[in-house]
Regions:
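Single conserved hydrophobic/aromatic residue that forms the stacking wall/gate
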Residues: 1-7, 11
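Cofactor-binding active-site loop characterized by glycine-rich and histidine/acidic residues
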Residues: 20-150, 168-174, 179, 184-186
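Short gly/pro/ser/thr-enriched loop/turn and capping motifs at secondary-structure boundaries
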Residues: 56, 162-165, 226-228
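Short, conserved beta-strand edge motifs with alternating hydrophobic and charged residues
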Residues: 157-158, 190-193, 200, 219-223
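Short beta-alpha connecting loops at secondary-structure transitions
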Residues: 162-167, 187-192, 237-245, 270
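A short, conserved beta-to-alpha structural element at the edge of catalytic cores
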Residues: 150-170
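Glycine/aspartate-rich loop-and-adjacent alpha/beta segment that forms the canonical ThDP
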Residues: 210-306
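Conserved thiamine diphosphate
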Residues: 118-122, 174-206, 249-275
């Protein structure tokens, strides 16, 4: 819920519309079940790398929301010192290696991290997230090949939200399921309902057991959906309101709320208290991010390598 609230805050006029958030901003609204469900199998020492829709991922790694929002607003206290913005968030302490703006570029890097885990004999898994739009990139196939060839502890997670920017998956990808493209390299995998937290959780546990038992990579295709446009500047004219509204009927956050109420008999008042507490936390996060100082000009020259 905190992830959803923080994403919605980006939409408000006083932040993105008022120019408080600069550059691009890719929201994760609708896809929360993927990153939260994966947590069921994650080891605190595992590493995570993803593309530019990274807000939900870094929050799930336990990074303070104040640091995340301060990065969005380009402040000194941001997790990347205000220099990364929405798309380039990193936290070595939380083993989160980005936040990458180039489609598919994070995949070979994630395989490299997996190689490091194996080389150092670490009992860790490199979790590599990528979108459906990256699944036709050559470097992704090269990464699949090396991960399989070297038997690396890598879990590839495809967040198939049906659109690569404004291009539907049906117009960009021929053949069968996306995860099956990795099978030619000997990588086993499956496709899962990525709008259902419990399905995601079960698949993540299966994946971890397979990787640990066989010392080989695994791939999961998460069938999910983004409720907002590709980025804040995208009006989403390539899909109908009916399509979006139909998908909102299986909103993972609302579905989880219904499950807690009906199956786990959690009281409505308890959920309201949680939501109220999160709203207060988010107000504090917003206040902190806007009061944080801007980076010093000398930061322009730090972390620059020639």
């Amino acid at each position: 819920v905190r992830s959803r609230r923080q994403r919605q805050m980006c939409i408000r006029d006083r932040l993105y519309g008022a120019g408080k958030i600069g550059g691009f901003c890719h929201l994760y609204i609708g896809q929360e079940a993927v990153v939260i469900g994966i947590l069921s199998s994650i080891n605190s020492e595992d590493t995570v790398i993803t593309a530019y829709r990274d807000h939900g991922h870094i929050l799930a790694r336990g990074v303070d929301p104040k640091l995340v929002m301060s990065e969005l607003t380009g402040r000194k206290d941001g997790i990347s010192k205000g220099k990364g913005g929405s798309m380039h968030m990193f936290s070595k302490a939380n083993r989160f290696y980005g936040g990458h703006g180039i489609v598919g570029a994070q995949v070979p890097l994630g395989v490299g991290i997996g190689f490091a885990h194996k080389y150092r004999n670490e009992k860790k898994i490199s979790r590599v997230y990528l979108g459906d739009g990256a699944m036709s990139n050559g470097q992704v196939f090269e990464a699949f090949n090396l991960a399989s060839l070297w038997e690396l502890p890598v879990l590839f997670i495809i967040e198939n939200n049906k659109y690569g920017m404004g291009t539907s998956i049906g117009r960009s990808a021929a053949g069968g399921e996306l995860y099956e493209r990795a099978t030619v390299f000997g990588i086993k995998g499956e496709k899962v309902d990525g709008m259902n937290f419990f399905n995601v959780s079960e698949s993540a546990i299966r994946a971890r057991e397979y990787i640990e038992k066989n010392s080989k990579p695994y791939i999961i295709e998460m069938d999910t959906y983004r409720f907002r446009g590709h980025s804040m500047s995208d009006p989403g004219l390539y899909r109908t309101k009916d399509e979006v509204n139909k998908m909102k009927e299986i909103d993972p956050v609302l579905m989880m709320k219904e499950t807690l109420l009906n199956d786990y008999k959690i009281q409505e008042d308890t959920i309201k208290d949680i939501e109220s507490d999160i709203k207060k936390q988010i107000k504090d996060v917003e206040k902190f991010s806007l009061e944080s100082p801007l980076p010093d000009l000398k930061e322009l020259y730090t972390e620059v390598y020639l």
